[in-house]
Amino acid sequence: KQINHLINEIERSEWVDDKMIGCAAIILTGLSYQNKIRYLDFGLNLLKKIIKFSFDNEGFPKSRNIRQLNFYLKHFVLIREWLKESQNDIPEYINEAIYHLGQAYTLVWQSIKINILFNGNHESNNDDFDNYLSRLGYKFKNENNEIGGYVILKNKKTALVMDVGSNPEKKFSNNYQSGALSFEIISEGKKLICNSGFFQNYSHQLNDISKSTATHSTLTIDNQSSCKLRRLGNKHSRVEQGLKIIKKSIVIEKNYWSIGSAHDGYSKSYGVIHDRQIEFFPEQNKFIGFDKLIKKKNFISTNFEIRFHLEPNIKTMKTQDGKFIFIELENQGWRFSCNNHKIDIETGLYFGKKNTYTENQNIFISGVTQNENQIIKWELTKIT
């Protein structure tokens, strides 16, 4: 009776995560009782529908949500192990889903072992799950450096992560944050540049704040986000007016990395395309960024800021002449500079831990958009 009720509830539920949990329960019921084979068939068919509805062509969640990626991988592995232990055939679509989810998981988590704060993610410890996968013999490899709209370039000491993906469809955008072209830098296992994280409680105003472009390490025009979100009643805010990624390039060589991309999120309202290229020179431990503001026909002049968020434990100091900002990250020292534009430090909010916030600092470049194409060049160099 309870499973029949669950089946009815699944049909009515809007949340795919709820469907996934219910699907697992129905499959377990079908495996546990000999005369309940119809539940197993129903559950496996539902699982196939979830894959078709929720995953893109690369097997990554259409929401682009990394927490959801982990959630799906855990449940697919669990269901596969139940089928194996009960000596039932394992459908190929389950193996394929685990293969693709595992490839993504090893790139966005296992290869760097630090949570990247994009699109609904916050700090969590996946070590127990890693041990669980290892104990069951699941080993994933990924030779690529891009998945789900995220690029991760790395060596033994440094990782550069950037969001080069368009926004998800409206129905998958509950946890989307307007951080197109935002980036994070990991240096010697510590986060040097970060995004501000995600406040998960959607009924709290901090949820909307954490979704804004200003809480990401990227460019903001006129204090507006690159995507317009709309809240319906007391539900999640969703993408109302989105953006498209209109170019992308990735280079990784031994002594030179580069990620380049552009989006049109400010084109309609302000007549500006944001084009960003970040270069890294491993031998010099130097990052050079080029934020290009490309003017379109409907250009409107207004203010802009480019923010570089820092974790709460990081200390900063601006030189008296205002030309440099020094960053102290434990035993590392870094120097930030930007010629021809004002740089400063401001206090913000960090949402890295689930449903909590604390003050942090961010470095920002400020200026006014010009009636011609602009290039804002900035540098971040390790000095100790």
Stretches with model-predicted labels:
Residues 1-98:
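Aromatic-lined, polymer-binding surfaces characteristic
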Residues 2, 6, 72, 101, ...:
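Alpha-helical packing segments of well-folded alpha/beta enzyme cores
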Residues 12, 170-173, 206:
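Catalytic micro-motifs at enzyme active sites that drive phosphoryl/nucleotidyl and oxygen chemistry
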Residues 16, 201-384:
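CBM-like, beta-strand-rich accessory domains located in the C-terminal region of large
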Residues 22, 149, 179-181, 215, ...:
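Residues that flank catalytic or metal-binding motifs in active/ligand-binding sites
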Residues 60-194, 198, 370:
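Carbohydrate-active enzyme catalytic cores, enriched for enzymes
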